[in-house]
Amino acid sequence: MADVTVEVRGSNGAFYKGFIKDVHEDSLTVVFENNWQPERQVPFNEVRLPPPPDIKKEISEGDEVEVYSRANDQEPCGWWLAKVRMMKGEFYVIEYAACDATYNEIVTFERLRPVNQNKTVKKNTFFKCTVDVPEDLREACANENAHKDFKKAVGACRIFYHPETTQLMILSASEATVKRVNILSDMHLRSIRTKLMLMSRNEEATKHLECTKQLAAAFHEEFVVREDLMGLAIGTHGSNIQQARKVPGVTAIELDEDTGTFRIYGESAEAVKKARGFMEFVEDFIQVPRNLVGKVIGKNGKVIQEIVDKSGVVRVRIEGDNENKLPREDGMVPFVFVGTKESIGNVQVLLEYHIAYLKEVEQLRMERLQIDEQLRQIGSRSYSGRGRGRRGPNYTSGYGTNSELSNPSETESERKDELSDWSLAGEDDRETRHQRDSRRRPGGRGRSVSGGRGRGGPRGGKSSISSVLKDPDSNPYSLLDNTESDQTADTDASESHHSTNRRRRSRRRRTDEDAVLMDGMTESDTASVNENGLVTVADYISRAESQSRQRNLPRETLAKNKKEMAKDVIEEHGPSEKAINGPTSASGDEIPNVPRTPGEEKTKNLKEESTQEAAVLNGVS
């Protein structure tokens, strides 16, 4: 601020020293020396520039001079106008012009100077220009020492930063300064930014130096990471280094990228070791027996993937036979793993345990094979353990013969073969089957006796329909009755069959729950046959509708039409149709309830086939 010095006229006529702070349209903002007066704006006509410093001091008697003095002790010294009255050596007797003529004072030569010839300032006496300061440089520009070289280059009287307008103020008494400021301002701001960056780096280096000196006596570890593993050690966007720095007690981590060396400093050995575990990545291999490689990998790599996930390694590679980078033992295949030291240790434990398990299992399997071989040599029956070996067609459980209910080997094709055999069987076989089926439980196992759409329903009135055909005078509505006594009788009768039909009864017992086509042939009293002797689905539907209508009729209507229904049943089995379950007389006589031998039945059928009309498919003539 001392660079732009002016003299401000006081109320007593003396000129006091001041400094220009800002230039306005018609005034100056002035700060007084030692702040004896507050900062204020002074008009141009009360301000003048001081005389040049190299002015010659040639003073003689009678000259007007200016005396550096003060009116009282409370005011500072100022330049007062006076006149020299006498000279004696270095002392001068002066008379103040502003005071009475009687007020004289003796002063020394140093307090005197010739009268200042400078006039009061005008509007074009001082020039001011401004430069906008970027936000990142405002703090640096607040220091006036940063503009020392710039001030000298442009010839300014003063350069300072104005915080309210965020601008640099350049004050000068020369108009050429404004042109130079416009030329050099950008360069000046760039130089400030560069200096600021260098100063910041120097400060960081100084702090690092101090920190290094302090850490030299603390705990530290140093390790080297291979160049191809450096990316894993650093982590994505330096995540591993950041994680290591967050370990409590770690003070600094340094990395020399040229040599791949990490240096960790900490307050304790445990903290340094823990931080090292995050960044120290290594590659190691484990030898696996060749015959166990497939089992170690697992189906679709499931086993080796589980080992990798649990251990924490990041990569696994199996070295090929044509690669000789690693030492290889006979009959062994190297598995190469990449990860931290801790994860490599984990994978070694997991893999060694799994290999030991596989070897033990292989040993047990070999012992089993030896035992089986010894059993075959002795001649005993084959051993059937709980392994995964195949079972032959003659396999037995070893605990007795297979029961009828525990033999699950019958397939759907065997059932169809059985049905086709029965459809082509003779009348004697059908009669035997008819007698056996009539003794079964009418509703099937665990099924309702109402004869609905369930799987056990159609068998409910099987034997009763045959009895109606043989005895038309009987009550046809007995088909709807299913008493407990009938079930008991059927159950008793079903247990008295001959042992020669044991296999066939076992098959039929398993298929009783399914509504098969053969059951429809023996059960229906109205169904017609096709060329192969099979009953169609339409026949089942018509029979179910007929039975449903019979059940829904009122009791009075049922009692009234009993005899008519019996006659209809007899007429349906007249000479116009072929009988399903046996031959009928050509004259339409009632069927005698007399049993015939199988030979008589066949002879009777041959005679009737020559005289009766050929049956049409589905019973339509």
Curated annotation (Swiss-Prot):
Compositionally skewed regions (Basic and acidic residues) per UniProt: 553-576, 598-610
GO cellular component terms given for this protein: axon; cytoplasmic ribonucleoprotein granule; cytoplasmic stress granule; dendritic spine; intracellular membraneless organelle; nuclear envelope; presynapse
Ranges where the record places region CC2 domain: 353-379
Residues that bear Phosphoserine: S403, S406, S409, S420, S423, S485, S524, S587
Cellular compartment(s): Cytoplasm, Cytoplasmic ribonucleoprotein granule; Cytoplasm, Stress granule; Cytoplasm; Cell projection, Dendrite
Stretches with biased composition (Basic residues): 499-509
Key words, A-Z: Acetylation, Cell projection, Cytoplasm, Developmental protein, Differentiation, Isopeptide bond, Methylation, Myogenesis, Nucleus, Phosphoprotein, Repeat, RNA-binding, Spermatogenesis, Synapse, Ubl conjugation
Biased composition (Acidic residues): 483-493
Recorded family membership: Belongs to the FMR1 family.
Role: mRNA-binding protein that acts as a regulator of mRNAs translation and/or stability, and which is required for various processes, such as neurogenesis, muscle development and spermatogenesis. Specifically binds to AU-rich elements (AREs) in the 3'-UTR of target mRNAs. Promotes formation of some phase-separated membraneless compartment by undergoing liquid-liquid phase separation upon binding to AREs-containing mRNAs, leading to assemble mRNAs into cytoplasmic ribonucleoprotein granules that concentrate mRNAs with associated regulatory factors.
UniProt protein name: RNA-binding protein FXR1
Origin species: Cricetulus griseus (Chinese hamster)
